[in-house]
Curated annotation (Swiss-Prot):
Residues annotated for D-ribulose 5-phosphate binding in this entry: 37-38, 42, 150-154, 174
The protein's annotated pathway: Cofactor biosynthesis; riboflavin biosynthesis; 2-hydroxy-3-oxobutyl phosphate from D-ribulose 5-phosphate: step 1/1
InterPro entries: DHBP_synth_RibB-like_a/b_dom, DHBP_synthase_RibB
GO biological process: riboflavin biosynthetic process
Residue sites binding Mg(2+) 1 per the record: 38
The keyword Calcium appears for this protein: no
NCBIfam families (UniProt xref): ribB (TIGR00506)
Organism: Shewanella piezotolerans (strain WP3 / JCM 13877)
Annotated site residues (Essential for catalytic activity) in this chain: 136, 174
PANTHER family linked to this entry: 3,4-DIHYDROXY-2-BUTANONE 4-PHOSPHATE SYNTHASE (PTHR21327:SF38), GTP CYCLOHYDROLASE II-RELATED (PTHR21327)
Name assigned to this protein: 3,4-dihydroxy-2-butanone 4-phosphate synthase
Pfam family, one: DHBP_synthase
Entry keywords, A to Z: Lyase, Magnesium, Manganese, Metal-binding, Riboflavin biosynthesis
Biological classification of the source: Bacteria, Pseudomonadati, Pseudomonadota, Gammaproteobacteria, Alteromonadales
Cofactor binding, note field: Binds 2 divalent metal cations per subunit. Magnesium or manganese.
Amino acid sequence: MNQSLLAPYGNAIERVNAALTALREGKGVLVVDDEDRENEGDLIYSAETLTNEQMALLIRECSGIVCLCLTDERITQLELPPMVVDNNSQYGTAFTVSIEAKEGVTTGVSAADRVTTVKAAIADGAKPGDLARPGHVYPLRARPGGVLERRGHTEGTVDLMKLAGLKPFGVLCEVTLPDGTMARLPEIVEFGQQHNMPVLTIEDIVAYRNSQ
């Protein structure tokens, strides 16, 4: 990871603290993973505070595949089976079947509809019957040990929400460039400056958790 690009954001602990402050204020954060892994940056919001405007930004500036990171317990509560029985994707990303809110949506594709789906899935008393399957929001199952178990954006998202004292659920989408290619660290830093969002890495979250 090119730490010089991240230097303006402080050290690892300072970068995580800045992200936690932003999340508590209902703002987005940008998380980059290891260069020898996916080497991509995700725009992440708290599912609890997510707005229609933020979802529209995710759809407009990112890949469009908006994912909802959930804990093991919530996946079980909602009875969401894996998308496939034999997950042989390169990094073992734990997609479940896609979902849609049963009520309050039309086609399910609009920013407002996707927010409605997210809110239905994270509601305190959410039940399996509250969601239709398939849909236009893609849940991801986070490993219980977080980034200390798997250094993925899914685990990083849930860890950040827990550390921020929020519900342990977040939405993410990979930041892309206008030509459809993936944004790397230099572009992620530029995006963060444009949108006043903190930038941090999965490695930062690992360091933060190990320091506690």
